């Protein structure tokens, strides 16, 4: 069994070794199913802010952080967004919850 890394982005393809999610709803499903598949846990969530045309399927990616907070989940997070305001908003959620941000 291995730890899973999740890449959440609508445009940039996932690096090798990552599960690529393009929507918030897809990422939620992957996270909820992690116990049922081949992984022992989630090593990292590498996340963009802007979901582009995929926003209709769960909102911009910051909504995933809101959901993680609501459900009490805690995983290391890396933000790879080019949106400086979005990055700061995501960092506030990460810091408020005491989550680990990988830079």
Write out the residue ranges for each language-model feature.
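Catalytic phosphate/metal-binding cores of nucleic-acid and nucleotide-processing enzymes, i.e., regions
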Residues: 1-103
């Amino acid at each position: 069994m291995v730890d899973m890394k999740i890449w959440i982005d609508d445009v940039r393809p996932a690096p090798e070794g990552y599960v690529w999610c393009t929507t918030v709803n897809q990422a939620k499903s992957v996270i909820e199913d992690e116990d049922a598949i081949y992984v022992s846990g989630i090593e990292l969530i590498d996340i963009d802010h802007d979901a582009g045309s995929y926003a209709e399927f769960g909102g911009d990616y910051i909504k995933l952080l809101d959901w993680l907070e609501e459900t009490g989940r805690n995983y290391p997070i890396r933000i790879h967004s080019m949106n400086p305001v979005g990055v700061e908003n995501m960092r506030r959620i990460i810091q408020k919850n005491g989550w680990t941000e990988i830079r």
